[in-house]
């Protein structure tokens, strides 16, 4: 006599706090064990790539803030680099240092949210409260430099929108001095915590070969022991002048990926310190009048400057025909922008490569054979945001 073993089909999300957005999972369960995971995406699709085709190059920048809304400036960075590549324009050194400085602040902004929310999913509330206090300070720096806490719209092809306000560099320096011990406090709470290790060690293991085959990048790739970081392998702006290490894991499990993110924040502190020390004086925008608007003082004196300013912001500037792909090491992995121009003031095609899209595809093989509670841990370690996955 044979027993017919029935599997249970379970719907998780999209309105579930642990799915980190609008993720819907169809789980095939054998009791408590997961047999199959089928992610349903597209619930936050806004047609960003198509919308960008109907905007000028300047008007397209805010769309990048709204993809991975946890780390907006890194995505603006990729778009700015792509447009600069087609324009073949020089970026002032001060602007390059400012962009690297804020990219690293953005990395801390992302990782603090990821570690805090991952701890909360597992049942530890303290790290979230400690880390959100630090995130608030970084968001204040965002606000001081761009006027906005989240959707900054700060990076520009050819530099940045505005120079740093007085006293900001000193305040960032003070922040990183006190952030270092705060990060050590979080480590002391989690690193050797018995419950934390039970929930993360040997969960969601990704071997080196699997990580490469699935197209993983960022901490998901480095957690498996592959030292691939675009800031080292394909440096952009002034990363080649800055001294930092690339942290890697050994086992490719959730615990190693957590440690990689912690160590990356220490490296970000080192990079920010070097940016503050080496920050040169000078312009923050290219001096090409086709890209940079005239100053307020000039507009008060000259009608031509007024017309130039108006036309620059209504019609934009023309970008030479051609195609390019530029990628940055965003906090979640490789964020790339493929730009195709036909020589007018709007992108003909803007293809966006997001790291979370590749990582979510690996959820099925990572969670197979684990308990349902472990699926929540794996979703947290993927560090997914649906703004960038659904686009």
Curated annotation (Swiss-Prot):
It is found in: Cell inner membrane. One of its GO terms (molecular function) is NAD binding. One of its GO terms (cellular component) is plasma membrane. It is a peripheral membrane protein. It catalyses: a quinone + NADH + 5 H(+)(in) = a quinol + NAD(+) + 4 H(+)(out). Its EC number is 7.1.1.-. SUPFAM superfamilies: HydB/Nqo4-like. It comes from the Bacteria. InterPro entries: NADH_Q_OxRdtase_suD, NADH_UbQ_OxRdtase_49kDa_CS, NDH1_su_D/H, NiFe-Hase_large. Keywords: Cell inner membrane, Cell membrane, Membrane, NAD, Quinone, Translocase, Transport, Ubiquinone. The keyword Zinc does not apply. Pfam families: Complex1_49kDa. Its main location: membrane. NDH-1 is composed of 14 different subunits. Subunits NuoB, C, D, E, F, and G constitute the peripheral sector of the complex. Belongs to the complex I 49 kDa subunit family. NDH-1 shuttles electrons from NADH, via FMN and iron-sulfur (Fe-S) centers, to quinones in the respiratory chain. The immediate electron acceptor for the enzyme in this species is believed to be ubiquinone. Couples the redox reaction to proton translocation (for every two electrons transferred, four hydrogen ions are translocated across the cytoplasmic membrane), and thus conserves the redox energy in a proton gradient. This is NADH-quinone oxidoreductase subunit D.
């Amino acid at each position: 006599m044979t027993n017919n073993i029935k599997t249970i089909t379970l719907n998780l999300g999209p309105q579930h706090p642990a799915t980190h957005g609008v993720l819907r999972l169809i789980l095939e369960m054998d009791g408590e064990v997961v047999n199959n995971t089928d992610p349903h995406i597209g619930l936050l699709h806004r047609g960003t790539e198509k919308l960008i085709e109907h905007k000028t190059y300047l008007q397209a920048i805010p769309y990048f803030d709204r993809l991975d809304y946890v780390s907006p400036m890194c995505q603006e960075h990729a778009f700015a680099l792509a447009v600069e590549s087609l324009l073949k324009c020089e970026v002032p050194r001060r602007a390059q240092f400012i962009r690297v400085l804020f990219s690293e602040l953005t990395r801390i902004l992302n990782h603090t949210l990821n570690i805090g929310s991952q701890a909360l999913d597992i049942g530890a509330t303290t790290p979230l409260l400690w880390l959100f206090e630090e995130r608030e300070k970084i968001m204040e720096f965002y606000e001081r430099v761009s006027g906005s806490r989240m959707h900054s719209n700060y990076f520009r092809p050819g530099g940045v929108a505005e120079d740093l306000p007085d006293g900001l560099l000193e305040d960032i320096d003070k922040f990183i001095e006190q952030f270092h011990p705060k990060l050590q406090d979080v480590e002391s709470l989690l690193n050797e915590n018995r419950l934390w290790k039970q929930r993360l060690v040997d969960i969601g293991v990704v071997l080196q070969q699997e990580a490469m085959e699935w197209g993983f990048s960022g901490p998901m790739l480095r957690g498996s022991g592959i030292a691939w970081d675009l800031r080292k392998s394909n440096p952009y702006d002034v990363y080649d002048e800055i001294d930092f290490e690339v942290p890697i894991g050994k086992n490719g499990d959730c615990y190693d990926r957590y440690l990689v993110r912690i160590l990356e924040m220490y490296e970000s502190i080192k990079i920010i310190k070097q940016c503050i020390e080496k920050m040169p004086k000078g312009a923050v925008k290219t001096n090409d009048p086709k890209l940079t608007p005239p100053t307020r003082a000039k507009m008060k004196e000259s009608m031509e400057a007024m017309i130039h300013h108006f036309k620059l912001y209504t019609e934009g500037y023309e970008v030479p025909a051609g195609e390019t792909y530029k990628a940055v090491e965003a906090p979640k992995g490789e964020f790339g922008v493929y730009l195709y121009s036909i020589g007018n003031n709007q992108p003909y095609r803007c293809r966006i490569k997001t790291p979370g899209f590749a990582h979510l595809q690996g959820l099925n093989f990572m969670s197979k054979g684990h308990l349902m509670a472990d699926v929540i841990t794996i979703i947290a370690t993927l560090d997914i945001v649906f703004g960038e996955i659904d686009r």
